[in-house]
Amino acid sequence: MIRTGFDEMYEADGQVRPHYRAFARWLAETPDELLAQRRREADLLFHRAGITFTLYGDEQGTERLIPFDTIPRSIPASEWRVVERGCIQRVKALNMFLADLYHEQRIIRAGIIPAEQVLANEQYQLAMQGLDLHRDIYAHICGVDLVRDGDGTYYVLEDNLRTPSGVSYMLEDRKMMMRLFPELFAAQRIAPIDHYPNLLLDTLRSASPLDDPSVVVLTPGRFNSAFFEHAFLAREMGVELVEGADLFVRDDKVFMRTTDGPKAVDVIYRRLDDAFLDPLAFNPDSMLGVPGLLSSYRSGNVVLANAIGTGVADDKSVYPFVTDMIKFYLDEEPILKNVPTWQCRNPAELSHVLANLPDLVVKETQGSGGYGMLVGPAATTAQIDAFRERIKAKPHAYIAQPTLSLSTCPTFVENGIAPRHIDLRPFVLSGRETRVVPGGLTRVALREGSLVVNSSQGGGTKDTWVVED
């Protein structure tokens, strides 16, 4: 059983952890009214900058501010180095799995992953079978979601290999903290993160075999929940932000419409799902994609980052096999552990899940954003019974895990400061080399007792510091 109750700032006896001592002294010496004023300034600055997300399912389609908490999540550098190595190891194995899956399928023949687990997965793309990619990289940009147990051990909760979001909030949170509290950064060595856009652009350029490829960011448009991030990253990289209608394919090559005439496009950082990329190949009703894009991609005339078909590797039903992938492809022991997982597609595991629903977290294998899940200890009897019937009807569509009490971090709440549950999403870039910007996005569940940190479910964010020991 995974233990729970780890606080990022305080030891079990209430003493401040060494890497938080400088911040704790500053917090104790700073008047409450000044802290409140700075928090109000942060809200105003975020609003002026347009740092919002769209809440799907909201009747008004409301754009909302991402709540930002000014107490940072701090990680000692020695601890971070382990996390960094673990994330790099994991993403390397996942890329090797994708290259293998779409070619020789050695891992299936070795009996490590059942064929039906991946080949019948709706995220598996037959169009990618046998297609060679530059450097054999499928997932150029990845987000690895981490949580901690009671003794501070990191566990990977899930991998995000399709269109991981949140990095713009990571960067804006840091800008905000440096603007509002410059004295904190002068008092200790905090690893910088402002070079991420340059690393991202270098990663995208290196995805092409060309010496000087042209890069664009493809967005579904301003009504997408992450549109702020799409525009932010395009601006920071100095590349064009385009929608599907801005691009066209001629002679199996992709061009961008400009006032000076067509301009060739070599690399597309796409922020829309596979199904909407090309109405000729996938969803014929898509108005967001580019007709003929798949043909151009298969001809090697354009690079897509991330590649089509990466979703099969971050599907929740494939998650339990990632540690086996690391051993199989890298011949290494996993640095970061998986959360124990029961697959409802297996009859014996299904029986265990159905018998223990009040104690488990159950997730749809295709779910995301905190939707399509049951948190047993927080659910009513009626909700548990309804979920039991859904699982029985489609057992292959669900996995279950023990309920984790995510680590907590002191957070400003209405009545002062209180612990709130957090997770961490480091961003991993795979190009000529695999790199991770120090820290990542810390998400915080602002509702007391809540374990759901997603912004779509009322979660907020914190700046993440990697502090020299």
Identify the residue ranges that each predicted region occupies:
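Preference for protein termini
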Residues: 1-469
